[in-house]
Amino acid sequence: MSLYDDLGVETSDSKTEGWSKNFKLLQSQLQVKKAALTQAKSQRTKQSTVLAPVIDLKRGGSSDDRQIVDTPPHVAAGLKDPVPSGFSAGEVLIPLADEYDPMFPNDYEKVVKRQREERQRQRELERQKEIEEREKRRKDRHEASGFARRPDPDSDEDEDYERERRKRSMGGAAIAPPTSLVEKDKELPRDFPYEEDSRPRSQSSKAAIPPPVYEEQDRPRSPTGPSNSFLANMGGTVAHKIMQKYGFREGQGLGKHEQGLSTALSVEKTSKRGGKIIVGDATEKDASKKSDSNPLTEILKCPTKVVLLRNMVGAGEVDEDLEVETKEECEKYGKVGKCVIFEIPGAPDDEAVRIFLEFERVESAIKAVVDLNGRYFGGRVVKACFYNLDKFRVLDLAEQV
């Protein structure tokens, strides 16, 4: 007895397991189909009967005159295409007469084309019907009704449509002139022929009417006088009236104090969508004020290691903790070497007390000046600047800054 006798030995069929099963199934199907065909042929030959020729024995005469009528063999009905008894009609092996064959042409394309044409025809009919209804509504809208030949009052929708169309076609509304100009217009004398033409005829007009265009020889002339050249330059009496409304008089200068304007007006932006008009001289003053109010750029031109702080405390407010607190506060900008507090007697309150801070690096001093200048401390605005290092070391602390 061997050591491996109890183990199953694999047969050679497992090696061809991937294709042998399908091949065996095909062979079995072919055998079944062949058996069905042979069985049907044998049954057809057994059940078909052939009758003998018919001989008419009643008629007299010789045997040569006898007529033999041959009739075709009679085949029993229903046995032409027998169905094998071993298979049902629903099995796959039985060939069907209407079985679908993808290689055989069918009417699918014709059916799809017919349905597409039908949908297109239906769509065209709906579109034509909609056009006819629209034309009918348009005719009914313009058609008059009643004895007075007035439009039908029930067509509210048509009236709304006409109203909207009228609003769209109408131009922008003109703004009525101010009442002050109208009042001054009434006060003007009647001996000016051009005044009557330029007067607004109706304030309720919906659209602005352009001025009439004249040839050079037909243009109305303004009256002769000392202000004729000015009126010609100002473009007519309308501009003259506007200037008079804002206080212009012949021979006087423009401006609040009649000083005249030597520079053009400028506009200063105050917000995202707002601004104000500034006279040229005022712009120069504002620019100088801005340069004076922000002298930080001037301070940073000559940096040193010594920072001078003014207006931190008033005269007589210096205590023992001020030096320590100031030094600790300025340690965040860099290492502070020395802190000195000096008070000038008889000086103004914002210049009386000076606090000097000596940093080890110039960069730390610059950070301190940028951060402390303009900062609020105890209700006061701190003034920070640089101080000469040599004068600080010899304790010359009262120099004018």
Curated annotation (Swiss-Prot):
GO terms under cellular component: nucleoplasm; spliceosomal complex
Mutation effect (residue 319 to A): Impairs interaction with SF1; has minor effect on interaction with SF3B1 and U2AF2
Phosphothreonine modification, residue list: 71, 237
Source organism, top-level taxon: Eukaryota
Cross-link (Glycyl lysine isopeptide (Lys-Gly) (interchain with G-Cter in SUMO2)): 15, 24, 33, 41, 58, 256, 276
GO MF terms, alphabetically ordered: RNA binding
RRM domain segment(s): 306-385
Record field: compositional bias (Basic and acidic residues): 57-68, 114-153, 182-200
Record-listed Phosphoserine modification sites: 2, 155, 169, 222, 266, 291, 293
Resulting phenotype, residue 376 to A: Impairs interaction with SF3B1, SF1 and U2AF2. Abolishes regulation of alternative splicing
Gene Ontology terms: biological process: alternative mRNA splicing, via spliceosome; mRNA cis splicing, via spliceosome
Residues covered by region (Disordered): 57-84, 114-233
Cell location: Nucleus
Modified residues (N6-acetyllysine): 21, 41
Modification N-acetylserine occurs at: 2
InterPro entries linked to this entry: G_patch_dom, Nucleotide-bd_a/b_plait_sf, RBD_domain_sf, RBM17, RRM_dom, RRM_dom_euk, SPF45_RRM
Domain G-patch per the UniProt entry, residue ranges: 235-283
Pfam families: G-patch, RRM_1
Role summary: Splice factor that binds to the single-stranded 3'AG at the exon/intron border and promotes its utilization in the second catalytic step. Involved in the regulation of alternative splicing and the utilization of cryptic splice sites. Promotes the utilization of a cryptic splice site created by the beta-110 mutation in the HBB gene. The resulting frameshift leads to sickle cell anemia.
Complex and partners: Binds SXL. Associates with the spliceosome. Interacts with SF3B1, SF1 and U2AF2.
Descriptive protein name: Splicing factor 45
Organism, scientific name: Homo sapiens
Primary gene name: RBM17
